[in-house]
């Protein structure tokens, strides 16, 4: 197998520009065949696979290509249409399907697309299965093709959205409502554009919608979780109680309090961990966070007697750590929140409902709930790169890192890493003084840009 084929799967499935390698129709057909081949290899017999997508224009062709590959191998496919990624995980379990596939590039721009694969339990598939799929694609060996009378059928699940809406609402306490709450909601013109407003409205909230008119080419376009300034302004303008921003596939959430201040994944994790611990519902009194988690948040959790386990960045790594340590809550600063009591992957809508529940039960505003959390000054800069050359092979970059670490001493830290899903290098500096961390982060970002870059992303 070539080096390129081994890199087919990244940290969150396969992702790239639509109609360019690896995100081509041809590869999607082969992937469908390979998924079918792996299912037959592990358990011969009849199989069923769920297929969902977000609102990208290219989703139609990838949906058709995957279904063609799957059905050609005798697999029954259940097509859901636009639905959040956590909806695919849920429907896969609810229909007792053998696998689920989500066609999405998450927070990436519309011209990208991607493919995420879930097991029958609703978890993202393991590295072992990803490697086996890649082997089948590389060798074009998918096992025995069925006779013409045994090819699979394709069915459209017309009530998929409705089922997921009811599932999400069921994670909110029975008998309680959101009556009296005014919510500004930004769905990023993505997969949650119908589902999310329905969930909050059916629970009696007043919902003001942004990013709920997808065109196929406006997903994540200056809206959603990556651009919370939209709901920051809207919350103030509409005098709302809270703002909720989701990303393109609905598995990530950023919130805004009634004062227009951002409440990121770190703070959501803290709010929910504190609540679960008070109710003796936090497994082992521990949570899983990542290397990006703010030091001030870690100190706050420690003050509550909550152990924080640190994983690599990526919801897949967070989940793996949760399963290994039997934790039921984990999350990332970027807004991937995993509540294993409810779902098997990050779920923006369910996460929002848990925070809203805590607000109602405690009769608190969102700013009240975060008032005791003092975050350390932190700077994060994204640098677009032409290629991902190993950072430890770049002497100038390594020298800059040593200088910054020396400047920070024991009072701060620096993290430099490539994104697992985009050609981006992320610079994070944390310390005691805001002006210092901003300056040091800019220094590193400029050096990375000069060595590898295609420009700093504001």
From Swiss-Prot:
Gene3D superfamilies: Alpha-D-Glucose-1,6-Bisphosphate, subunit A, domain 3, Alpha-D-phosphohexomutase, C-terminal domain. Activated by phosphorylation. Its cofactor is Mg(2+). The active site is at 106 (phosphoserine intermediate). GO terms for biological process: carbohydrate metabolic process; peptidoglycan biosynthetic process; UDP-N-acetylglucosamine biosynthetic process. Its EC number is 5.4.2.10. Keywords: Isomerase, Magnesium, Metal-binding, Phosphoprotein. PROSITE patterns: PGM_PMM. GO terms for cellular component: cytosol. It comes from the Bacteria. One of its GO terms (molecular function) is phosphoglucosamine mutase activity. NCBIfam families: glmM, PRK10887.1. HAMAP family: GlmM_B. This is Phosphoglucosamine mutase. The gene is glmM.
